[in-house]
Amino acid sequence: MISPNLTANVEIDGKQYNTFTEPPKALAGERAKVKFPIKDMTEFLHGGEENVTMIERLMTELERDPVLNVSGDYDMPKEQLRETAVARIAALSGHWKKDTEKEALLRSQLHGIVDMGTRIRLGVHTGLFMGAIRGSGTKEQYDYWVRKGAADVKGFYGCFAMTELGHGSNVAGLETTATYIQDTDEFIINTPNTGATKWWIGGAAHSATHTACFARLLVDGKDYGVKIFVVQLRDVSSHSLMPGIALGDIGKKMGRDAIDNGWIQFTNVRIPRQNMLMKYAKVSSTGKVSQPPLAQLTYGALIGGRVTMIADSFFVSQRFITIALRYACVRRQFGTTPGQPETKIIDYPYHQRRLLPLLAFTYAMKMAADQSQIQYDQTTDLLQTIDPKDKGALGKAIVDLKELFASSAGLKAFTTWTCANIIDQCRQACGGHGYSGYNGFGQAYADWVVQCTWEGDNNVLCLSMGRGLIQSCLGHRKGKPLGSSVGYLANKGLEQATLSGRDLKDPKVLIEAWEKVANGAIQRATDKFVELTKGGLSPDQAFEELSQQRFQCAKIHTRKHLVTAFYERINASAKADVKPYLINLANLFTLWSIEEDSGLFLREGFLQPKDIDQVTELVNHYCKEVRDQVAGYTDAFGLSDWFINAPIGNYDGDVYKHYFAKVNQQNPAQNPRPPYYESTLRPFLFREDEDDDICELDEE
């Protein structure tokens, strides 16, 4: 093997230059350019010094636990990944006695940066199953299941059986039934047909002892819609199946092989009446049914999942944008000046255009994720303490929940889509080395993209959000109050707002631009809805006719939300020494977003055709500003090499050394002849064809 010290030596202007050893110097040079305190930027990102201290402590604990080390996962088969995931879940849960709820969630999220499979295999229980118990069960029911071991995952493992083979996004169309039997005070759970088989259920194949099962409530022949029932799947001592339960493994997936996704069928499975979660919908022993004032009250666990996925979009995006930008800072290709080293790819304007807006988007995601988490915590706290008989308080809670339901749907959709795009664009930006399994992009993409379809298909979520935006606008026209996120619909001044010589670098102007475009799209869609319904279409038919407009409204409103959240956070908590650099990043994100959808701003009249060139010039300007500080922006994420888990993205920039070592560590030198040489390769290379005999005869 060639010594690294002998590779790639060239002489330029009488100086020795080595492309193998130069990258660490290049990245050190980038760090020397940084003009802001990275510590202050990190504290801004994570909400203050106290949070940063907690995150750093949790990261250190994760790194020091050998069970959680993922460095060998890229070559690990499915069966081993699943077994390893259980060991890692045990390691993570070992901290729960001392962890606060916030710390436990954050510990799992941080580990999920490099191990999405374990993150979700545990999260199905802690987030979805326990979220369903907490959100839809009474206090007495929650306490009961905690005593059974649910909170500590002791003798108990929960899964979340919502999706069916024949239904996913349309929860109201689920077919599994729960029939109340008054004589025995029980429900009988049944899978009426193959299409009603519970499908994709994480934890079902191997782990789960219980499930939160979504089923149609049937009482005295009447269908009361889908409710949640806790059903035992396995005996907690022997792990054997309970009577009437059939389940299996759905097998190989595109990614997340560590998760034991399975299918479940129920045949006359009896459960006590108390196993129906009855915080909102209730069934008495006499069969009397009381319904909640809002169906979404039952689906609180889903909202919590979506809010978490917004945060996960940031956690994963920060890893891959860091890898791509560090690599861009040390990778040299081609050159424009004779006698000089090749050019760093980060210095090519087009490469800046590819990556730096995605860096800005990653920061924006963090601001929106934190805002959504606060909104979710406030709403769920209210729902936990509210008296269902207090109509006024319940009415306010329902308004808050509707707003959270809509905003989390849009943010979940567009942040998970963006994260998938960031992973793939960063892979492409790393050229051939991005295709190596050891640099993480392939596994991460395969693991991540399920986020775009589970817990709400992104397109369906956008259409649902668009419908809600039109309904908010209709309600406002009838005198109903607007939620805070759509308050701009009441701003009549937006109709006349234009750039009109104002400064496009002014955040107030940029926010107004997005509000005007969002307002215009929603008002126009609402006008069309009114026109269609007056023309004879039912509301549902009119909404279907407006599907494209609904999607567009959701897209614009969500981007406005991201823009606003970014600037609001800067104004609220950025220290003076980092604020200008954050404004540069926020302006890049906002102007790039305008450039991407410039037609909207022309249509609404905020911009004139002559203004588009100015937008493009400003995007180029901010790319240059951000480029000079790029090492600081990425270092501020605070990710060690353990969390990067990609040799071309290591902190020291020694990409070729680490990459070459990783490949050889995972693929040690062996017999140069492959194990199939004698059985397959040699017979192929030395095969005798009939044509060979004919040629020999011809020669004779």
Swiss-Prot record:
PANTHER family: ACYL-COENZYME A OXIDASE-LIKE PROTEIN, ELECTRON TRANSPORT OXIDOREDUCTASE. Pathway: Lipid metabolism; peroxisomal fatty acid beta-oxidation. It comes from the Eukaryota. Its cofactor is FAD. This is Acyl-coenzyme A oxidase 3. The keyword Lipid metabolism applies. Heteropentamer composed of five different subunits. It catalyses: a 2,3-saturated acyl-CoA + O2 = a (2E)-enoyl-CoA + H2O2. It is an enzyme of class 1 (oxidoreductase). Oxidizes aliphatic acyl-CoA substrates of different chain lengths such as hexanoyl-CoA, decanoyl-CoA and myristoyl-CoA as well as aromatic/heterocyclic ring-substituted chromogenic substrates, such as furylpropionyl-CoA. Of the above substrates, the efficiency of the enzyme, exhibits the following order: decanoyl-CoA > myristoyl-CoA > hexanoyl-CoA > furyl-propionyl-CoA. Optimum pH is 7.4. Keywords: FAD, Fatty acid metabolism, Flavoprotein, Lipid metabolism, Oxidoreductase, Peroxisome. It is found in: Peroxisome. One of its GO terms (cellular component) is peroxisome. Belongs to the acyl-CoA oxidase family. InterPro entries: ACOX_C_alpha1 (IPR055060), Acyl-CoA_ox_N (IPR029320), Acyl-CoA_Oxase/DH_mid-dom (IPR006091), Acyl-CoA_Oxase/DH_mid-dom_sf (IPR046373), Acyl-CoA_oxidase (IPR012258), Acyl-CoA_oxidase_C (IPR002655), AcylCo_DH-like_C (IPR036250), AcylCoA_DH/ox_N_sf (IPR037069). The keyword Methyltransferase does not apply. Its main location: other. Its EC number is 1.3.3.6. One of its GO terms (biological process) is fatty acid beta-oxidation using acyl-CoA oxidase.
